[in-house]
Amino acid sequence: MLPQVILNHLGSIGEAASTWFSENKYFGSVGQCPPLPKGDLNYDIYMGYPEMFAWDKKRCVAYVSNLYNATVSTWDPYKSVVLDTIHFPGLSHAGNSASPNPLHASGIILRPDAYHAETLEVVIDNGDAFYSDGFNVSGPDHLMSIDLKTKEVTSQLRLNNGLYAGYADASLGPDGNTYVLGTYSSNILRVTPDKEISTFYVAEPLGPPRLYGFTGIAHVGDAMIVPDNIIGQLIRFDVRDKVGTPVTIKQTPYHEFKTANVLHFPERYNDTILLVAENMTPDYPYGGVSVYQDKTKQFNEVEFLGFLPSRLTNALTTSARQMADRIYVVALPTDGANITVAGESSRFPFQDITEELDLMILPEIKDEARDEI
């Protein structure tokens, strides 16, 4: 832990950084939601174990996917209170046992977009695909649709075809289609608004053995970005293609990863910054967030700016996303009987990394800030 005088100094630099960004119109729009206070937030729910969240800019709440019990909670970060929790009949469960029900809640998106959210889509995946290291891809895996006015399930679409699975994330493409990403073998499904499913991409061979491949997914323009943990590279697809063709994104300097998870383009930085959560690294056993930049927003190649380690211990970093005007890291505690089940935790800190990101993205403002302190 840093001495308070250093923390105060960093806070002053961070405030100056935020002022610099705002004056230079670097920040993207954050909608009508009021700003959140600086500092970490606490997501309090018994056995919640969050993996990621989606920010509703219409209602100013977050929808949090509770991994181990396959539920989704509506959370008000301003009041630090869980408003409700959506349970899926026949799918959601207690979470403290992976037998007979190993289902998870993972990828989560808003339709038609975060500003006019009417429908929530959630991936309910078979955790056994991950526990078995890709051997069991039998499913079931579902894409659930929920009416945000009534909180009722309006659609339950089975994703799995028995050949490849490991579904862990989803993203809404610029073409209006939902893209669901699988890990074993690396694959991407395209789901139309009419719930028609096609395979946009699948890596050969189908296995087994199946290696830990694609994980997170995010869109910027017509580009779809995913991390390939097998080769430790960021991969780019063009959603305008009928069938996806993977293209490796050049990194300068190269940053190796093997446990990348959720990806995110924060609106705060006008889609010029890509955040990649990493569960763990050789240097940081509890993971953190790698930061990439492309000022052109094309993401044909990126500059690796650095890595922000998680401040939590005994937890795996799973995602880093924007909520209102700030960026938070979500980490999954590993206090269960094993990695496949929930423990007894009731409080889950969301780490605020906004100031650290601001300074990393434009380090030259440190000198300007110090002159003002």
UniProtKB/Swiss-Prot annotation:
Belongs to the TRI14 family. This is Core trichothecene cluster (CTC) protein 14. Part of the core gene cluster that mediates the biosynthesis of trichothecenes, a very large family of chemically related bicyclic sesquiterpene compounds acting as mycotoxins, including T2-toxin. The biosynthesis of trichothecenes begins with the cyclization of farnesyl diphosphate to trichodiene and is catalyzed by the trichodiene synthase TRI5. Trichodiene undergoes a series of oxygenations catalyzed by the cytochrome P450 monooxygenase TRI4. Disruption phenotype: Does not affect the production of trichothecenes. Induction: Expression is positively regulated by the trichothecene cluster-specific transcription activator TRI10.
